[in-house]
Amino acid sequence: MHGREAIEAHYRVAGARMAGLPVYNPALTVELLGWRAVEGVGALGVLITPWCMNLFWQPPADAELPASGERAVLSLPSGDYECTLHEDERLGRHASASLCSPMQDFPGQAEARAMAGEVLRLILAVPEAGPEPSRSGLLSRRALFRRALGGAS
């Protein structure tokens, strides 16, 4: 598992190239929030950048997954999340799922961190005991944000 600092440094370099684009929000900085190992999954966190917010997933090295550019499903107790796989010389194999882009609706880092924290809380939540939830479909980005913002799921 790569460390949070290495991942953030990689995206800071990318940020230098993005700085002049209209999608870039200069009130934000690169931060990987909640980066942690999750048993059976690998490691994950929410990556905040001035141009996007992504779920960032690093699967275990021995995971059998499709090629870079293809989609893979990250299965957590809270649901299944479709991610795009990437292969990078510095970061190795990792995947991302777009949560928000562009980031102009966030006036500052505190608001972006609050949203990222709520997303982490929701995706890492273990459902309460009861009937087995339906896993018939992937949780859409819209449904995840509706839950994060306190709406019905």
Swiss-Prot record:
InterPro entries xrefs: NiFe-hyd_HybE, NiFe-hyd_HybE_sf
Pfam families: NiFe-hyd_HybE
Family stated for the protein in its record: Belongs to the HupJ family.
Protein name stated in the entry: Hydrogenase expression/formation protein HoxT
Species name: Azotobacter vinelandii
